[in-house]
Design a protein with these regions (language model features):
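C-terminal secondary-structure termini that scaffold catalytic or DNA-interacting sites
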Residues: 199-206
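Catalytic-site neighborhood detector that most strongly recognizes the C-terminal catalytic loop/helix
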Residues: 33, 94, 172, 177-197
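Conserved tyrosine-mediated DNA breakage-rejoining catalytic core shared by Y-recombinases
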Residues: 70-109
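Short, basic (Lys/Arg/His-rich) helix/loop patches that form interaction surfaces
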Residues: 116-121, 131-170, 174
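Major-groove DNA-contacting interfaces characterized by cationic-aromatic clusters
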Residues: 16, 89-91, 104-136
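Basic, Lys/Arg- and aromatic-enriched nucleic-acid-binding interface segment
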Residues: 25-28, 36-65
Length: 206
């Protein structure tokens, strides 16, 4: 709307100043994620090795697609082993540096794949190709997901397994914990169970 009013002003139309307009913030909806069953179905799907590596990297670490594409062989080889996971620093959104932790078997699989090409990066597939392949997979499997859905799925599983929200925030590279709270998905059953705890407490005081 602001852009439209500026356009009108530049064309000589005397409209209301955009600074006088208050636009209420629309709350962000919960992040879309895959269920455990859908994850298993996805991993059983027959796909190109490079696409599988990209999916595994995003799904097992919460990396964005741009972060996965920039990951180099040298980074992996020099990664420090922490609690059975390889710690790698990636340059995320707004050029913020953060740590991601990659499972050993996925590191081995990624390096095995990367040996087949001469690029410095682990993945030798362009961004558009990954997006194109994912669209085909979603069509074949009958449920929608994007590269970012894989990141959402990783973060959702952490939250659902009772990980501290502030730790998940650091792993995700979010600027605030409010953004991370989008992964606090709750079913009607779970909400009812929580509400029942208070009701039980009140009844016990009668």
């Amino acid at each position: 709307m602001k852009a439209f009013l500026n356009f009108c002003y530049n064309r000589g139309y005397h409209t209301l100043s955009w600074s006088a307009i208050f636009l209420p913030k629309v709350p962000k909806s919960e992040a879309h994620y895959l269920t455990e069953k859908q994850v298993h179905t996805l991993l059983e799907y027959d796909m190109d090795e490079g696409i599988r590596v990209s999916i595994l990297l995003m799904l097992s670490t919460g990396m964005r697609i741009s972060e996965a594409l920039s990951l180099t062989k040298n980074q992996i080889k020099k990664a420090e082993l922490v609690e059975g996971l390889y710690q790698v620093s990636v340059l995320g959104k707004c050029r913020k540096l953060r740590s991601v932790f990659i499972p050993q078997d996925i590191v081995a699989y990624s390096l095995q794949y990367a040996c087949n090409h001469t690029k410095d990066q682990i993945l030798d597939i362009p961004y558009w190709k990954i997006q194109q392949k994912l669209k085909k997979i979603t069509k074949d499997l009958g449920f929608y997901f994007s590269a970012h859905t894989l990141r959402h799925t990783y973060l959702t599983f952490l939250v659902k397994n009772k990980w501290d929200l502030y730790k998940v925030q650091r792993l995700a590279g979010h600027s605030t914990v409010a953004i991370t709270s989008r992964y606090l998905h709750a079913t009607d059953y779970e909400l009812a169970e929580t509400a029942k705890l208070v009701n039980n407490l009140l009844q016990s005081t009668d």
